[in-house]
């Protein structure tokens, strides 16, 4: 019978690990394994999950490093002028080819709620970088509708911002001004609010008058 591991289950499992990491008394380490020489013609052995394999791995560790901090991450998409961005759609099954959120040069994260469109209804490129910290959606001059989500602090950027991934977190309290901005956005969110619509069949025979 076909089955999938849902994203919700994955997030729940990660949340459990992070919660355990954040709790007092829990410590996590990254192990550094032994070095092995390989000839160019060798085939890499496929790892298997067995008690013996895990035991051998633990016994051959060269060293371990204690993990100081952890974070959820998502793919990084830098805002770039001339790019078409997708409006968020709850029917997405994965990250779309056109991103629906962006990171600006100021390390602020915005979600796209509506694409800019031309007179024929075709999507246009984004040419105005979103800015500002409003808790409500706003429209830029290119027709795109954005909403500010959060800012990545210097500490989080230093620890978790890479060329391909960025920090993301749902806060329950704030310890600095940037986190306060995110708390304001979270508190202002309205569950079930309609922030956009899509015309799936426009029909024919209409005039503009």
Residue ranges and their predicted role:
Residues 1-109, 113-209:
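Feature for peripheral, non-core segments
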């Amino acid at each position: 019978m076909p089955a999938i591991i849902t994203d919700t289950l994955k997030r729940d499992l990660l949340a459990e690990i992070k919660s355990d990491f954040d709790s007092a008394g829990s410590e996590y380490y990254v192990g550094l394994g032994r070095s092995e020489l390989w000839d160019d013609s060798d085939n890499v052995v496929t790892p298997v999950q067995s008690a013996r394999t895990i035991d051998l791995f633990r016994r051959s560790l060269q060293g371990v490093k204690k993990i100081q901090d952890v974070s959820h991450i998502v793919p990084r998409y830098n805002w770039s002028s001339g790019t078409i961005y997708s409006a968020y759609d709850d029917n997405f099954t994965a990250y779309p080819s056109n991103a629906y959120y962006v990171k600006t040069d100021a390390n602020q994260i915005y979600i796209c709620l509506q694409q800019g469109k031309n007179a024929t209804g075709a999507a246009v490129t984004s040419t105005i970088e979103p800015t500002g910290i409003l808790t409500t959606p706003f429209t830029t001059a290119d027709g795109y509708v954005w909403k500010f989500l959060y800012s990545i602090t210097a500490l989080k950027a230093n620890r978790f911002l890479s060329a391909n991934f960025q920090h993301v977190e749902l806060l329950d309290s704030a310890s600095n001004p940037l986190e306060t901005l995110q708390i304001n956005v979270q508190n202002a969110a309205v569950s079930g609010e309609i922030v956009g619509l899509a015309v799936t069949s426009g029909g024919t025979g209409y005039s503009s008058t």
